[in-house]
Amino acid sequence: VLLSGERTALNYLQRLSGIATYTHSVAKLLEGSETKLLDTRKTTPGMRIFEKYAVRIGGGCNHRYNLSDGVLLKDNHIDAAGGVKEAIAAAKAYAPFVRKIEVETENLDMVKEAVEAGADIIMLDNMTPEQMAEAIRVIDGRAETECSGNITKENIKTITSLGVDYVSSGALTHSAPILDISLKHLRVLEG
């Protein structure tokens, strides 16, 4: 029975073990900091629950499973609402009070607007470390901070040294190398 499902079982094992192993290697780089490593919703269709579990096993944290898990105002929401302040006001009017409101920002003007409008979490998206440092100074503890976009093993220590609360990376699930696992040495046990 095992051999009839060998390829499928190995595909799952290789993929999920690769995610857990890669996540662990990135999480080790955060040791000694207060920064939490988050995954994203960039997962394989039908595999989200398993891939997010692999991230947790590897030492990362899950951001959101789906859109109902939290309010994340992205550029298209901000544009549709007419600006950062308007998007936050609309979210506060309609979201349950227990939900944090996170805003994706791309520049310092957006960061300032998000702080003034009372965002709970401000995502610094695709910013340079210098831009992130300035944004963190502007935020000055008035909101939690999350850095995302172009996060690599090579630059993650620089980013966490800025004092960010969270670093999110889609690479944990969409770019983790698959582990080479086989059933080559499998033996039948008698009895």
Describe the role of every protein-language-model region.
Residues K153:
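Cys/His-rich Zn2+-binding cysteine-cluster or related metal-binding knuckle/ribbon modules and their
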Residues V1-A117, I121, E130-V138, E144-C147, ...:
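Acidic/glycine-rich phosphate/pyrophosphate-binding loops and surrounding catalytic core
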Residues A171-G191:
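Short, charged, intrinsically disordered terminal tails
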Residues L124:
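Active-site core of metal-dependent hydrolases
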Residues M127:
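Positively charged, low-complexity, intrinsically disordered RNA-binding extensions
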